[in-house]
Amino acid sequence: MPITPQQALQRTIEHREIFHDEMVDLMRQIMRGEVSDAMVSAILTGLRVKKETIGEIAGAATVMREFSRRVEVTDRCHMVDIVGTGGDGSHTFNISTCAMFVAAAGGAKVAKHGNRSVSSKSGSADALEALGAVIELQPEQVAASLAQTGIGFMYAPVHHPAMKVVAPVRREMGVRTIFNILGPLTNPACSPNILMGVFHPDLVGIQARVLQELGAERALVVWGRDGMDELSLGAGTLVGELRDGQVHEYEVHPEDFGIAMSASRNLKVADAAESRAMLLQVLDNVPGPALDIVALNAGAALYVAGVADSIADGIVRARQVLADGSARACLDAYVAFTQQATAQG
């Protein structure tokens, strides 16, 4: 028998787990709009207070994928998503968005799932719009973009229409809930590989094991000790790596890759315009901390995508495509594609 919302709430109050199959039933009820706003809010709060388990997160992610508008891709070789949970409060420029162009130029196919701002002054969607890209592409247009440019950006509201059901509740609550954790797990192109930044150290191991349960091939889940949801220059970075079906947790430092440490305040921006300017400086290969952190994260993406044999090798490849202009050319090609695709209807 499916679990009722009342039973689920009682479980959270008692700090007991909602088992995987029960979570699947519960999330289907929520996504179909069968659970009241008051009850949704109570359950989300209860889950947050007791702390979501691997089974609960995996069950909820399974349903979100089920309700999404998929991007059909035939060749997933070297495909990777570069994504963060947001919520780290760092207000940096769009590091993962910039790394997307570098990784694509380096030989990965980047199927990036993103939205508007959460923790930065400019989310991935905001940044791409500031660069001239059209973000609200339909699934078949995203698939074509991925095939032609090596990049497919999936704007979350287009691909997760069922999320409209819980949007008012989330907005009114104004706090992190399980949905902040679910976004990076629900890539509509079903990318088998992922570089994921998280906002809390506990999530490094949890999200890596959720991805393991969801059938991901390879993953790097990262949290910088300075609070960044990226591989950081300002401190060590905790890493949960999924490879060959096993999860290994370890720590890396910028010095491990011959990169100088630099505080995250050197990467801060005030708005989308400043973020755009810094992103373009990186793609034009202007030396500095911004270039270094993008090379580091793009290198990690190339490693997890299977293009590079190690993060260090990936960084070398990233610096090559930044230096020879390939990364900037990748941005220009992607923006042109989105504009043309929209003009053609």
Curated annotation (Swiss-Prot):
Q: From its record, what is one biological process in GO terms?
A: L-tryptophan biosynthetic process
Which pathway does the record list? Amino-acid biosynthesis; L-tryptophan biosynthesis; L-tryptophan from chorismate: step 2/5
UniProt-annotated binding residues for 5-phospho-alpha-D-ribose 1-diphosphate? 84, 87-88, 92, 94-97, 112-120, 124
Return any one Pfam family short name: Glycos_trans_3N
The free-text note explaining how the cofactor binds reads:
Binds 2 magnesium ions per monomer.
Q: Which Gene3D superfamilies match?
A: Nucleoside phosphorylase/phosphoribosyltransferase catalytic domain, Transferase, Pyrimidine Nucleoside Phosphorylase, Chain C
InterPro entries linked to this entry: Anthranilate_Pribosyl_Tfrase, Glycosyl_Trfase_fam3, Glycosyl_Trfase_fam3_N_dom, Glycosyl_Trfase_fam3_N_dom_sf, Nuc_phospho_transferase
The UniProt similarity line reads:
Belongs to the anthranilate phosphoribosyltransferase family.
Q: What is this protein called?
A: Anthranilate phosphoribosyltransferase
What is the source species?
Xanthomonas campestris pv. campestris (strain B100)
